[in-house]
Amino acid sequence: MRQIPPLRLHVPEPSGRPGHATDFSYLPLSRAGEVRKPALDTGYRENTDLAFSLIRVLDDGGEAVGPWADPAIEPELLRKGLQVMIRTRIFDARMLIAQRQKKISFYMQSLGEEAIGTGQALALEAGDMCFPSYRQQNLLIAKDVPLSALMCQLYSNECDPLKGRQLPVMYSMREQGFFSISGNLATQFVQAVGWAMASAIKGDTRIASAWIGDGATAASDFQTALTFAHVYQAPVVLNVINNQWAISTFQAIAGGEHTTFAARGLGSGIVSLRADGNDFLAVVAVSRWAIERARNNLGPTLIEWVSYRAGPHSTSDDPSKYRPADDWSRFPLGDPIERLKQHLMRMGHWSEEEHHATQKRYEAEVIKAQKEAESHGSLLTGQTSSVSTMFEDVYAEMPWHLRRQRQQLGV
């Protein structure tokens, strides 16, 4: 009688845990410059290879190589990108300390991922709408939104533009093309596709761009967004940031073990690319390509950005419990700030002295902005928006039952 082996459930495991170094060979990598650049109007069938390779521009020596090395990227744009990334990292570090001092309740930094939001922010045009997750504060910093305004939202103080209605880091700035961040995963993909469809229906020229993490690709809204984007050829860029971890869950749990996240788009008939998210030049080049496709009615593009979440998921997380403490230092794609710095220095457009001076200038700017924000209140001082604001900004004409409740509160 034939012996049938018992069934076994496969549960993916990371190659590294505390005390055991991560083997990053699980990441399919390509050499800088070796991945081809297709024509804008080619379809997903002709480009399936791009969902499994890795678009890279900067080599180990900091030189821009290959077909994605865009000569139209001006040195001034690269300098701006480096400055925004430095400013973001300093802002993040300061807000992390503020949370530890109990001045704010919660914070999420973008350490190690700064190039992705910054590069695409500088590739988009005014009027385009971004649907970010909670690690794209550099979209706003790249647009020179006052740091004190961001801090007031974090402090939930009397000058909080959202009047305390959102969790810290869940910004909303319509005038900056920054849609309200939601704590529910993958919702922004559906929202971005719907907004892009509306833009097309109106005959507008504005496109949408959305960001989610690798873990959120397991949510049903991800598949819904892909279906609508493909069927209606929505003018949208769909960004998946594969930073290896969804809180304490390794990216393989979301489906990254046997295929890539970019490959998810192929099944929906969407042109899908996989790119180095720590290579600022690759981010700008790939973003411009996808944005141009969307703006020219060539449909959506799904981009998987390979990066690494260098810090904790949030201030409520302790990554030392589930991964090696030195993981980021051994991540093969490096630090996005150091890589762009190396490239600019190689070109003669940056120096160690300017780098040091820039850091000092932004440190002083962040401290000044923090003092201004704290003058309007923090969790320690208790200065918050008036209770009356809970009745505002919902109805054009307040219904009777809310008017009665407001009267009962005496506000």
Predicted segments with their positions:
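Short beta-alpha connecting loops at secondary-structure transitions
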Residues: 245-251, 270-276, 320-329, 353-355
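Glycine-rich, charged/polar anion/phosphate-binding loops
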Residues: 222-225, 285-292
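Short, ordered loop/turn segments at secondary-structure junctions
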Residues: 135, 241-244, 277-278, 306-308
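Conserved thiamine diphosphate
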Residues: 197-204, 257-289, 332-359
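Cofactor-binding active-site loop characterized by glycine-rich and histidine/acidic residues
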Residues: 90, 97-234, 239, 250-257, ...
